[in-house]
């Protein structure tokens, strides 16, 4: 009987796969941030980013990649809930509680 576990394809090492995963994570965080600013208040995006780093990285001692992953999950959930409630941002603009007047806060560090 053959081993039913999945095998790494020939020519791929675990190191290359991990490096590709980190590149994917960084690309995905940047892409979701570019989309999120079209739907969510910048203040919310910044606060989620900042709190993710404070909690997961600083308080819990998790890695940068894990912290980015948790941030990605939270922003993805926020976008899902926003769209589920009937997104009209791109067609009609934000309603009450969308963008606040005044200059926007800075984007999440390293994701400008």
From Swiss-Prot:
Keywords per UniProt: Host nucleus, Host-virus interaction, Inhibition of host innate immune response by virus, Viral immunoevasion, Virion
Location within or outside the cell: Virion; Host nucleus
Motif (Nuclear localization signal): 65-72
Main location: virion
GO biological process: symbiont-mediated suppression of host innate immune response; viral life cycle
Stored Gene3D superfamilies: 1.20.5.4730
S-S bonds: none
GO CC annotation terms, alphabetical: host cell nucleus; virion component
InterPro entries linked: Lentiviral_Vpx_assoc_factor, RetroV_VpR/X
Oligomer and partners: Interacts with the P6 region of unprocessed GAG. Interacts with host VPRBP/DCAF1, leading to change substrate specificity of the CUL4A-DDB1 E3 ligase complex.
Function: Plays a role in nuclear translocation of the viral pre-integration complex (PIC), thus is required for the virus to infect non-dividing cells. Targets specific host proteins for degradation by the 26S proteasome. Acts by associating with the cellular CUL4A-DDB1 E3 ligase complex through direct interaction with host VPRPB/DCAF-1. This change in the E3 ligase substrate specificity results in the degradation of host SAMHD1. In turn, SAMHD1 depletion allows viral replication in host myeloid cells by preventing SAMHD1-mediated hydrolysis of intracellular dNTPs necessary for reverse transcription.
Other notes: This is a macaque isolate.
Family recorded in the similarity comment: Belongs to the lentivirus VPX protein family.
Protein name per its UniProtKB record: Protein Vpx
Source organism (scientific name): Simian immunodeficiency virus (isolate Mm142-83)
Taxonomic path: Viruses, Riboviria, Pararnavirae, Artverviricota, Revtraviricetes
